[in-house]
């Protein structure tokens, strides 16, 4: 092809959020297709998108690889015109990062406040000291190196570096309307700053005055003795994106297309143009085109030059990091295996230490060990998971909890001699105390060497529809109707049926336009947020590697690159993750120690100790149990019937897209239950290799269930090379690469079939791999989670009182709301007592035994809107010097420790709580110990003076006035009490809303949930109604929706097939009280579903709960006295049904997708 003749230096990608109209990858692809010499990505005060452009150069489908220029568009807060800044080498790149970091760290999240003085401070020609900095390479494996200026002689770059040139190349970008003197002044300041290395951009705007305008700019440039340089100031890779870019402008400026006016581009010309078009536009000034080539040729920097160095860790005098790691390993062996280890485990540990030494990863392991050590010193539960669970060294260091004697380890999946990839250790900490660990990391390494990885928040269907609707000027009702038809977070847009269900015309041109633009917008980056816990640490300044900015959360900073970006540039991260179940387990252990005198740690709970725990799980009794409480897992438990720890490993992994999409679940269950023989696939005609898969698939009965098995089949049976297997692993491991995994299909299935394997087996194996590309568990990860499955199941079985209390104190977390957690505990014999000012604390607590278990007293934290403090965060308050947050509960406890409460007036005076707090307590029925039910308490509270503690003489006066004026109050109906309970504490101990509607539904032939769940006749028609607890639409279910209904008798599980879902989308997605008719589907193991055929939203029936004629059905099972919160107050009369009360909507369901 002919030599390139143009380089576009002014590209704004969609990482200039709500401005650029194309992805960085699209610009690279288009530049390649156009044959451009180079392309410069310069986003607004950010480098967030450059790694994606850099990675795209590895795309084998590019027929030509343009040179990539890494830069940023500096936008100033002091009126300085925009400036494109491109570093010539690694040192200049470091200064650009620090410049951007300075602007970001003085501003709020997502903002960058720069002044010209900042540019002066960081634009120095002297190269800063950079320990370990290698000389920039003159070539890049990421780009075809073509001399972009024929006049530049070979060795020019070397001469520049020898002369000490290291600078930011600065291009002043004048706005469309400009004052000549302002541009002249800006150029004067820039040339005074660094002499050469300054340009003036010449940009055509196609508004009829380009010739005159560009001539003015050329005269200014000549007078300032700086070259003019051509650019199209690009906003999108193709002109078809103009409409979408207009929408982004409207979203950014909070306006509509009709009102935006001159905020919008006047034409569609701001796209990436071919050389010929740019040459035509600048035919009167061809040197402006040639200058783009000279500009690009002066830049040698590429991201290949980023040489990441992990921080050194402190070690004892005279020891290396590797020696110290070995010492800690030996100490761990002595602690975990006091009787010594066998030869096999010794060989495993020695092998791991050898690989760690060769890869020089010892400091990384020491870092994670230190973080875990700190957490445990603060009594914070933690455990490692993921591929790190393949490491015996991690186990004896106390990082992971998977005993290497219980499971076969595959260390090569974690760290390999062949793979040039850093290890990645994920450690889960209690979600309520993880912030303490994160602040410890900041203190230890400093904010210039430690920061959190970012997460790119992308447009998803709902947000895209909402923003496009607003930009196009659609009414809020129309936009909401369209958005409400979308289920979940991901998707490709709306179909015609969904539009019709929203009550809209799918042929309406405005609706069509909105849907088309929203579909195009899906997947666009919206803004950056912080990763859930991935830290990057560096030996030198992190802010010379990548810009750092402030997070929205106080005391948090994060870098501009996400986990895939740092992987591309080979940075190592430490994942400090939050897990609610660890909080629950620790709080459960604390309650057991406090009330039962026994202290437990995670390691004390052995997974083979209690056969009754497995029996409980076999029955599917897993509400609240980690990882196995979803409907799919509850249905799998009776079918798989786990009997040992490894069965739990399989249970965790089997209900995942990988095994499901690969059609591996049913064959495994049939073999496990003896319904089909265990056979191992083997290649026909290869007698010597007949059992080559037995060692891989032996533990899973010849059926591949885990990611590691799929990889090993690819290597050993499909004969993938290690490099190909690594590419396959990477494609499986990241969500972003879903779709690219398909390129391995022909090779893997073809190789398996060619070697004599059954084509069906070959295809199923690959379908499983594609499932892992969406979401799948490796064996090591499943083993880590299986440990917590057992511990939480043990807590539930052995200490249901402590488990319930701890779950409530750890909310929000898990699959079920407090009402279901409490209901499950009551079914297991635990008494639950209501919130009461005489007995409750801020947290839920255990009280004296009532039968086999302690009673659970609900705490003030259960009252919505009531202020309470979580003392798990006390260390953070102290470290920051902050005052603890207001805790109304603590005031109550402090007051009653001084003197018992005798009346509402005395309570108000003693606690000095604001009126708002008193109303919340009354509405939560928390004054029963003062012989006041909800209505009487609300009436009495409202008669008190507002927010003024009552003096003693005023108390007597107020009481006399109340006695004189008060009329007898009718008792609140029980139905209204139940609804009020749900509104205030999100559960009721007095009854269930459905029991008051039972007569209504019974008249319609509606069965109770228990009756449906106990039916064993397949195909029998049934009707059911209940409150929607959970909606779930897992990706592996191919559009099937699972719904859990609850009534006063229990729960029923619904299956909604895609066709029914589309027909009744509104009811499925929005109903709080759902009526359903369908057919029973019962499995031999006793798992029952109602397959829905018709659904009706009956939420309006909730209004009947305020009807004075509604009473509980006589057939309803009476509430057991054990769980009646009137037990504390026997002198209160039973509730009678007298008077209506406004009924509010019940709390929403928990929806998962």
Curated annotation (Swiss-Prot):
Q: What class of enzyme is it?
A: transferase
Q: What is its EC number?
A: 2.7.7.7
Please list the coiled coil stretches. Answer: none
Q: Which PANTHER family match?
A: DNA POLYMERASE III SUBUNIT ALPHA, ERROR-PRONE DNA POLYMERASE
Q: Which GO terms describe its cellular component?
A: cytoplasm
Write the protein's name.
Error-prone DNA polymerase
HAMAP family (UniProt xref): DNApol_error_prone
Q: Which GO terms describe its molecular function?
A: 3'-5' exonuclease activity; DNA-directed DNA polymerase activity; nucleic acid binding
Q: Which organism is it from?
A: Rhodopseudomonas palustris (strain BisA53)
Reactions catalysed according to its record? DNA(n) + a 2'-deoxyribonucleoside 5'-triphosphate = DNA(n+1) + diphosphate
Q: Where is the composition biased (Basic and acidic residues)?
A: 1116-1131
Q: Main role? A: DNA polymerase involved in damage-induced mutagenesis and translesion synthesis (TLS). It is not the major replicative DNA polymerase.
One protein family per Pfam? HHH_6
Q: Which UniProt keywords apply?
A: Cytoplasm, DNA damage, DNA repair, DNA replication, DNA-directed DNA polymerase, Nucleotidyltransferase, Transferase
């Amino acid at each position: 092809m002919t030599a390139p003749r143009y380089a576009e230096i002014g590209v704004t990608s969609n990482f200039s959020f709500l401005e650029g109209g194309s992805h960085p990858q699209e610009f690279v692809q288009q530049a390649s297709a156009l044959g451009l010499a180079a392309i410069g990505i310069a986003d607004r005060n950010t480098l967030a998108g450059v790694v994606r452009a850099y990675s795209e150069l590895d795309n084998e489908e590019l027929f030509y690889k343009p040179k990539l220029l890494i830069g940023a568009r500096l936008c100033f807060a002091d009126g300085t015109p925009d400036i494109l800044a491109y570093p010539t080498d690694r040192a200049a790149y470091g200064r650009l990062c620090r410049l951007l970091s300075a602007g970001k760290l003085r501003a709020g999240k997502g903002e960058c406040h720069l002044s010209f003085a900042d540019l002066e401070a960081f634009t120095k020609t002297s190269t800063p000291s950079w320990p370990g900095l290698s000389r920039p390479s003159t070539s890049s494996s990421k780009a075809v190196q073509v001399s972009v200026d024929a006049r530049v002689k070979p060795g020019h770059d070397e001469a520049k570096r020898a002369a000490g040139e290291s600078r930011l190349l600065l291009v002043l970008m004048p706005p469309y309307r400009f004052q000549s003197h302002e541009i002249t002044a800006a150029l004067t300041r820039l040339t005074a700053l660094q002499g050469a290395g300054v340009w003036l951009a010449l940009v055509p705007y196609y508004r009829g005055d380009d010739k005159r305008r560009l001539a003015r700019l050329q005269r200014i440039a000549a007078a300032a003795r700086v070259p003019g340089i051509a650019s199209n100031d690009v906003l999108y890779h193709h002109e078809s994106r103009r409409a979408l870019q207009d929408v982004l402008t409207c979203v950014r400026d909070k306006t509509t297309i009709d009102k935006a006016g001159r905020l919008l581009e006047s034409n569609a010309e701001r796209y990436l143009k071919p050389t010929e078009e740019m040459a035509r536009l600048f035919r009167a000034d061809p040197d402006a085109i040639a200058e783009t080539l000279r500009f690009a040729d002066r830049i040698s920097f590429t991201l290949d030059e980023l040489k990441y160095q992990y921080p050194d860790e402190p070690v004892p005098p005279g020891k290396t990091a590797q020696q110290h790691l070995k010492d800690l390993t030996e100490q761990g062996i002595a602690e975990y295996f006091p009787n010594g280890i066998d030869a096999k485990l010794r060989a495993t540990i020695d092998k791991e230490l050898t690989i760690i030494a060769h890869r020089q990863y010892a400091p990384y392991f020491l870092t994670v060990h230190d973080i875990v050590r700190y957490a445990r010193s603060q009594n914070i539960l933690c455990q490692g998971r993921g591929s790190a669970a393949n490491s015996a060294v991690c186990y004896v260091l106390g990082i992971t909890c998977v005993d290497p004697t219980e499971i076969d380890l595959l260390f090569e999946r974690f760290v390999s001699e062949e793979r040039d990839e850093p290890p990645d250790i994920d450690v889960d900490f209690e979600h309520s105390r993880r912030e303490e660990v994160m602040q410890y990391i900041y203190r230890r390494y400093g904010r210039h060497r430690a920061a959190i990885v970012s997460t790119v928040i992308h447009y998803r269907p709902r947000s895209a529809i909402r923003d496009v609707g607003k930009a196009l000027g659609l009414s809020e009702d129309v936009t909401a109707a369209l958005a409400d038809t979308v289920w979940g977070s991901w998707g490709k847009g709306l179909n015609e049926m969904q539009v019709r269900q929203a009550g809209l015309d799918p042929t309406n041109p405005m609706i069509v336009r909105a849907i088309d633009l929203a579909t195009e917008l899906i997947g666009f980056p919206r803004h950056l947020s912080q990763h859930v816990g991935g830290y990057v640490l560096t030996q030198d300044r992190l802010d010379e590697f990548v810009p750092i900015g402030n997070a929205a959360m106080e005391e948090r900073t994060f870098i501009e690159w996400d986990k895939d970006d740092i992987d591309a540039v080979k940075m190592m991260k430490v994942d400090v993750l939050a897990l609610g179940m660890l909080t629950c387990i620790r709080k459960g252990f604390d309650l057991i120690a406090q009330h039962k005198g026994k202290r437990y740690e995670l390691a004390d709970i052995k997974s083979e100790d209690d056969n009754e725990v497995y029996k409980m799980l076999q029955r599917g009794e897993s509400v609240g149990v980690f990882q196995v409480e979803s409907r799919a897992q509850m249905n799998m438990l009776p079918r798989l019937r786990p009997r040992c720890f490894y069965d739990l490993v399989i249970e965790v992994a089997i209900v995942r897209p990988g095994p499901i999409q690969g059609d591996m679940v049913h064959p495994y269950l049939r073999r496990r239950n003896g319904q089909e023989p265990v056979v191992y696939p083997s290649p026909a005609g290869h007698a010597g290799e007949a059992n080559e898969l037995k060692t891989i698939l032996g533990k899973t009965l010849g059926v591949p269930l885990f990611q590691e098995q799929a990889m090993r089949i690819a290597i050993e049976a499909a004969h993938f090379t290690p490099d190909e297997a690594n590419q396959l692993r990477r494609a499986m491991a990241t969500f972003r690469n879903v779709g690219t995994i398909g390129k391995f299909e022909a090779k893997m299935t073809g190789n398996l079939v060619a070697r004599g394997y059954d084509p069906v087996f070959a295809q199923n194996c690959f379908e499983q791999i594609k499932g892992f590309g969406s979401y799948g568990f490796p064996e090591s990860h499943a083993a880590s989670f299986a440990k917590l499955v057992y511990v939480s199941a043990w807590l539930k079985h052995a200490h249901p009182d402590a488990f319930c209390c701890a779950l409530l104190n750890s909310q929000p977390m898990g699959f079920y709301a407090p009402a279901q957690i409490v209901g499950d505990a009551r079914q297991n014999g635990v008494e639950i007592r209501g919130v009461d000012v005489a007995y409750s604390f801020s947290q839920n607590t255990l009280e004296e035994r009532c039968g086999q278990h302690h009673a659970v007293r609900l705490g003030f934290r259960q009252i919505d809107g009531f202020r309470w403090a979580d003392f798990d965060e006390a260390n953070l308050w102290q470290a920051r010097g902050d005052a603890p947050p207001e805790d109304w509960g603590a005031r109550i406890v402090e007051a009653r420790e001084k003197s018992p409460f005798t009346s509402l007036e005395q309570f108000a005076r003693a606690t000095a709580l604001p009126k708002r707090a008193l109303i919340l307590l009354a509405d939560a029925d928390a004054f029963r110990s003062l012989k006041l039910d909800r209505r009487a308490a609300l009436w009495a509270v409202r008669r008190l003076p507002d927010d003024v503690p009552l003096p003693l003489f005023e108390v007597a006066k107020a009481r006399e006035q109340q006695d004189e004026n008060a009329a007898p109050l009718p008792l609140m109906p029980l139905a209204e009490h139940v609804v009020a309970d749900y509104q205030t504490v999100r559960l009721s101990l007095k009854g269930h809303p459905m029991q008051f509607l039972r007569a209504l539904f019974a008249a319609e032939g509606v069965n109770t949930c228990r009756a449906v769940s106990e039916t064993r006749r397949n195909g029998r028609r049934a009707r059911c109604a209940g409150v929607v607890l959970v909606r779930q639409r897992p990706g592996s279910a191919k559009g099937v929706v699972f719904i859990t209904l609850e009534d006063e008798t229990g729960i029923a599980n619904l299956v909604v097939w895609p066709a029914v879902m589309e027909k009744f989308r509104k009811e499925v997605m929005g109903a709080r009280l759902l009526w359903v008719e369908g057919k029973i589907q019962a499995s031999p193991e006793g798992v029952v579903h109602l397959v829905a055929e018709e659904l009706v939203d009956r939420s309006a029936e909730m209004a009947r709960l305020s009807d004075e004629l509604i009473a509980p059905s006589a057939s309803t099972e009476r509430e057991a006295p054990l769980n009646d919160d009137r037990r504390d107050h026997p002198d209160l009369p039973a509730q009678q049904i007298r008077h209506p009360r406004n009924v509010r909507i019940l709390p929403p369901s928990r929806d998962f997708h």
